[in-house]
Each structure stands twice: as structure tokens, then as C-alpha cells.
């Protein structure tokens, strides 16, 4: 696509993305999940599309990040937004550390073996998480209550996921335009 048309399309997506929760207030939660799925699709494209690795391990790193974020929110004593911000950073850091530790041995495996290894790790992580009492085991983690009205919660998370999807897409797009991409 030419840069002019590409820019117009990006602006249109941004305008629709910003206006959507106000125009369609009854489906804001579903739209937030749409941005989450777009975020997953963009990140999976790096592994599965560009690198050719059919990975089932993305959920493992996502889970590590989410649990780390939830633990910071639960245990830090910070306010809601500060804990969410710090927790998101901690979650990203924990997921990155797990990727650095698990990446080299896994990336040495090719084809079906890689897919099976990442699937096995994801299943093992789910079993560990469901038995580990500190992180809530099978019951999960009770998080702090959103400090505003319940109607604002869905909109807040919509814009948070919209921003994360946009930043992730822009980062991957910039990466693809380098020599590495």
C-alpha cells in the first residue's frame, strides 16, 4: 500500500478506535477484547509469520506477565492506577526474562518439535499456576476494585488495550522496516 493511502487508513482506524466506545457503549467490553486479539495477532505474526515458528508458547509469556501484574496490584500497597502502571511494567519485565531464559533452548528446535515443546511448556505452566497457592491456585487472584464508576471501567480498559495494540503494531512495523525485519 502506498504511504498516502496507508496514512489515511491509519488515521481512519485511529478515529474509529477513539470514537467507538462513545458510539457503541453497549459493546465496549467486546471491543476491548477485539484490541486484545489484535495485539495477540500482531505479536504472533512476528513468531509464526515472519520467523516461521508455529508457537503455542505466546500464552505462557502472556500468563507470566498477567500474573506478575496482578501480584504487584495485590501486594504493592500502591493506588489502583499506580499499581496497574508498575504492575504492567513488572509483567513485561518478567515475561521478557522468561523469554530470555527459555528462548535460546527453544529456538534451537525446529518444525513440529518446536510447536510441541511450546505447547508442553504452556500446559505445564497452567498446571503449576493452578496448584500454586501464592498466586491464587485454581481460584485466581483477587484484584483491587476499580476506583471509578463501573461504566468507566470498560472504557478505561478499552483505551488501555487500544493504546497497547497501537504501540505494539507501530513497534513491529518499525522493526519490519529495519534490516532485521
What are these regions (language model features)?
Residues 1-181:
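Transmembrane alpha-helices and adjacent helix-loop boundaries
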Amino acid at each position: 500500500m502506498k504511504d498516502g493511502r496507508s496514512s489515511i487508513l491509519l488515521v481512519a482506524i485511529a478515529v474509529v478506535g477513539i470514537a467507538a466506545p462513545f458510539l457503541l457503549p453497549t459493546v465496549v467490553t467486546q471491543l476491548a477484547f477485539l484490541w486484545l486479539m489484535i495485539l495477540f495477532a500482531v505479536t504472533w505474526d512476528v513468531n509464526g509469520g515472519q520467523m516461521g515458528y508455529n508457537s503455542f508458547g505466546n500464552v505462557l509469556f502472556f500468563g507470566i506477565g498477567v500474573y506478575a501484574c496482578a501480584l504487584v496490584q495485590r501486594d504493592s500497597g500502591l493506588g489502583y492506577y499506580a499499581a496497574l502502571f508498575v504492575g504492567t511494567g513488572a509483567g513485561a519485565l518478567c515475561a521478557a526474562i522468561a523469554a530470555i531464559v527459555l528462548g535460546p533452548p527453544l529456538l534451537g528446535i525446529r518444525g513440529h518439535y518446536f510447536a510441541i515443546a511450546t505447547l508442553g511448556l504452556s500446559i505445564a505452566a497452567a498446571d503449576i499456576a493452578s496448584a500454586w497457592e501464592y498466586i491464587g491456585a485454581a481460584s485466581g487472584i483477587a484484584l483491587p476494585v476499580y476506583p471509578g464508576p463501573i461504566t468507566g471501567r470498560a472504557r478505561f480498559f478499552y483505551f488501555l488495550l487500544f493504546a497497547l495494540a497501537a504501540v505494539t503494531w507501530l513497534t513491529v512495523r518499525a522493526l519490519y522496516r529495519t534490516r532485521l525485519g
